[in-house]
Swiss-Prot record:
GO terms for biological process: maturation of SSU-rRNA from tricistronic rRNA transcript (SSU-rRNA, 5.8S rRNA, LSU-rRNA). Keywords: Methyltransferase, RNA-binding, rRNA processing, S-adenosyl-L-methionine, Transferase. Its EC number is 2.1.1.183. Belongs to the class I-like SAM-binding methyltransferase superfamily. rRNA adenine N(6)-methyltransferase family. S-adenosyl-L-methionine binds at residues 39, 41, 66, 87, 115, 130. It comes from Debaryomyces hansenii (strain ATCC 36239 / CBS 767 / BCRC 21394 / JCM 1990 / NBRC 0083 / IGC 2968) (Yeast). Gene3D superfamilies: 1.10.8.480, Vaccinia Virus protein VP39. This is Dimethyladenosine transferase. Residues 10-20 have a biased composition (Polar residues). InterPro entries: KsgA/Erm (IPR001737), rRNA_Ade_Mease_Trfase_CS (IPR020596), rRNA_Ade_methylase_Trfase_N (IPR020598), rRNA_adenine_dimethylase (IPR011530), SAM-dependent_MTases_sf (IPR029063). Specifically dimethylates two adjacent adenosines in the loop of a conserved hairpin near the 3'-end of 18S rRNA in the 40S particle.
Length: 327
């Protein structure tokens, strides 16, 4: 993964004192960039509620994504051993540094300046974020796919996105995101947050969710699981069989099957030799295996919108048994 530019500042602040004055100062200096999702949480009660729900321990390192002017940051600093704030806008990073300069918690804050999605993250125990809406999905998957995922994440999202995280099979909002996240973590709704609690106010309402990773972590390859779900949820209300008829999907599965055969033959024979059928016959083999799996599992006429984790696990296992892989 490419490393984003990384810069550290030493910093912290009075959690109750400078919220209003800091915002007035910022408004006089520059305009918030809503294209970067800069909607600053201005309600101190909501900010404190979010931090309290994280259950921060005095020994915890907390990652905050999109700290903005620091209304959450200063409260986190009061409870955590260290705060790592990931901020893309240099202006915000500078203002946050000023806000906490000279305070007792000054040395507890590091700021990572750059694109969060491209940044290689250090170890952290907890994540808190007033999430820029355009990175909601990448942020969730990046957190869950960390070598050592955070114990808990308290994340603010657009209301509809939050409801997708919580959706169950059969719900109208149930989708690949729902099935994927719920495999790796338990998700609960914490609170609704009105758009009037932000400056400038966004066009939509928000919700805060709590994501706690499952322990032990499911013994499943993340990319294999995600690869299967991508195919099944391309058209979630169509049959599973219909999703596997795409030429692009067949090409991917055929390529992966050839790799599987090559690896299996090399392990058995001590070399890379294998019999490679012509294109048409290999495609027919893959199609036949797909039909076999869907028929034997009984999922051919099922729809992804109605399937739960157990169903998808059965499907993934059956495909692996015939040598078909998704990553």
């Amino acid at each position: 993964m490419a490393k984003a530019a990384r810069k550290k500042f030493s910093t912290s602040s009075d959690p109750t004192g400078s919220t209003v004055s800091a915002e007035k100062h910022l408004n006089s200096v520059f305009k918030f960039n809503t294209n970067l999702g800069q909607h600053i949480l201005k309600n101190p009660l909501v900010a404190q509620g979010i931090v309290d729900k994280a259950g921060i321990k005095p020994s915890d390192i907390v990652l905050e994504v999109g700290p903005g002017t620091g209304n959450l940051t200063v409260r986190i600093l009061e409870q955590a051993r260290k705060v790592i704030a990931s901020e893309m806008d240099p202006r915000m990073a500078a203002e946050l540094t000023k806000r906490v300069h000279g305070t007792p918690n000054q040395k507890k804050l590091d700021i990572l300046l750059g694109d969060f999605i491209k940044t290689e993250l250090p170890y952290f125990d907890v994540c808190i974020s007033n999430t820029p809406y355009q990175i909601s999905s990448p942020l969730v998957f990046k957190l869950l796919n960390q070598p050592r995922p955070p114990r808990v994440s308290i994340l603010m999202f657009q209301r509809e996105f939050a409801m997708r995280l919580l959706a169950r099979p059969g719900d109208s909002l149930y989708c690949r995101l729902s099935a994927n996240v719920q495999m790796w973590a338990n998700v609960t709704h914490i609170m609704k947050v009105s758009k009037n609690n932000f400056r400038p106010p966004p066009q939509v309402e928000s919700s805060v969710v709590r994501i706690e990773v499952k322990v032990p972590r499911p013994n499943i390859d993340f990319n294999e699981w995600d690869g299967l779900l991508r195919i099944c949820f391309v058209r979630k209300n169509k049959t599973i069989a219909a999703g596997f008829k795409s030429n692009n999907i067949l090409d991917i599965l055929e390529k992966n099957y050839k790799t599987f055969l090559s690896t299996a033959n090399a392990a058995a024979n001590g070399d890379d030799s294998m019999m490679v059928d012509d294109k048409s016959s290999m495609t027919d083999i893959v199609k036949a295996k797909i039909e076999q799996v869907l028929t034997e599992t009984g999922f051919s006429d099922k729809r992804a919108a109605k399937l739960d984790q157990t169903d998808f696990l059965k499907l993934l296992y059956a495909f692996h048994q015939v040598g078909l892989h998704f990553a």
